[in-house]
Swiss-Prot record:
GO annotation (BP), single: methylation
Alphabetized UniProt keyword annotations: Methyltransferase, Transferase
UniProt cross-references to Pfam families, sorted A to Z: S-methyl_trans
All copies of domain Hcy-binding, residue ranges: 1-307
Name the UniProt record assigns to this protein: Uncharacterized protein C57A7.07c
Organism: Schizosaccharomyces pombe (strain 972 / ATCC 24843)
Amino acid sequence: MLMLDGGSTAILPKLPESISESRLWTSEALVRYPEIVVKHHEEFLKVCDIISTFTYQLDASIYDEKVEGVPLKQVYANSIGLPVYAREHLGLPNKYIALCLGSHAATIPGCMEYKMIYDKPTDFEMLYNFHKNRIEAIQASNPKAFEKIDFIAFESLPHVTEAEVVCQLIQDMKGWSKRCWITCTCPERSTIERVSSIISKILSINHDSIWGIGVNCFHLSLLEPIAKMLSSLLPSNITAILYPDGRGLYQNPDGTFSPGSTDHPAPSPEEWSTITAKYSNLHNGNLILGGCCETNYNHLSLLREKTK
């Protein structure tokens, strides 16, 4: 089992001002507070096997250089250069870095990757060019740092067409000589069947090119059924990927609960790590296990202790 970090939202409480209004979301920290981003990476490197870049929503389509005051090429260069620097600064060559790339839907305001809303959800060519152009721009911005990236993580894919696009791109580019994984969104229990169908489609296309498959940013209450679903679908040579979030639940009018608020309190780091650690041997340990939104160093350090 390899342990992933808690994602980029853990940086938000550490910033001197809010960046929640930025379309770049946590990628805005690369623009305004690169020194805090380095400290964020260094903190997680102390307990995790893999750290992830702040590039989830970073894309030319939503980046305004006049507003940000920093050339996008420089921000792209820092996005991979800062984690590489953090790893080398701490002298931890056996730790890994994942280039984190969100869905095209993540560039549409309103967390649309969780609502499966795109401008053109079945436009294969548009989605292909979106992902291809972004990776090429990141690579060109800092070729030396890109060489030192270990994984490429295509995250929060909510639609089967985009999953097909990513599979084709990975095959065409021979994975950029990286290990590539794909994760889907699963915001509700009712969406597990959709996720299962997307994963089945990925496996039917070209799973030889895909290193790992799983689900990211889902509520802890969905961990058990999602883990069972992955166990039933994934062949032994594909790494299972699971990173649940640390959020609470809100109560719907019908009395059911859904991810997104604190009407039902979020699990404590102790509770989150205890539940998550139970799945550390899933898929015979061929697994990446970590955190997502609203998990932090405390969650992951406790998970490390419980999975030693």
